């Protein structure tokens, strides 16, 4: 149980870390001052609120590179994210849990890589990555962490969709109804704003990454007007379940089966 793990999320899991200490991490991409650190038995656990204190940073302005690099510099090997997302599949309803297995990137202006041609990043095992780096994203989420999430949700008695295609848009606005129709035709099932570039950057730094999505609304044109208040309300209704899932994750032994994340 020695692997350091990180949880990236929002208020739904923040209360798990009341006794944690707050730390600040300097990175080449900026300082990250919102990380909280705690310990369960021999495992170090870090929590990073991606939107900053009091949900103050919109998705398109999050310093994703600083966030992920900070966790890397702390020795984190596994990242468990949580997301509030919209459903663009009528069979997946608000209140449902989904552990997605695929991503469609529809972002526009976010930095998507650490490797700009001149960057060198060194790893604990003595290896390094530098220059122009082309990585395999056939499976953008770690299969081992996905299985951990699926088992944890099932263990608390909740139903979980074990696959889904997360369409990540720029935000902070919600999508148009025409965009939702396009995403559906592309094979998307979920609409969100933050898994890109988190999953991409984590893979570049040889960290395993998966996310647990909670459906908070249907996509534009599938219901009446979407509001942020509605999203918050649904998430708050499931806060206890999200916390129980994270407790299961924190206290569980993690798979030693080799995945594609560190190759």
Predicted features by range, described:
Residues 1-137:
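Metabolite-binding pocket within alpha/beta catalytic cores that recognizes anionic/polar moieties
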Residues 136-185:
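Active-site rim beta-loop-alpha module in soluble metabolic enzymes
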Residues 220-263:
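His/Asp/Glu-rich mid-to-C-terminal helical/loop segments that flank catalytic regions of hydrolases
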Residues 72-75, 184, 203:
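Non-catalytic positions within long, well-ordered alpha-helices that form the structural scaffold/packing
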Residues 68, 180, 196-199:
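Generic hydrophobic/aromatic pocket-lining and core-packing "Φ" positions
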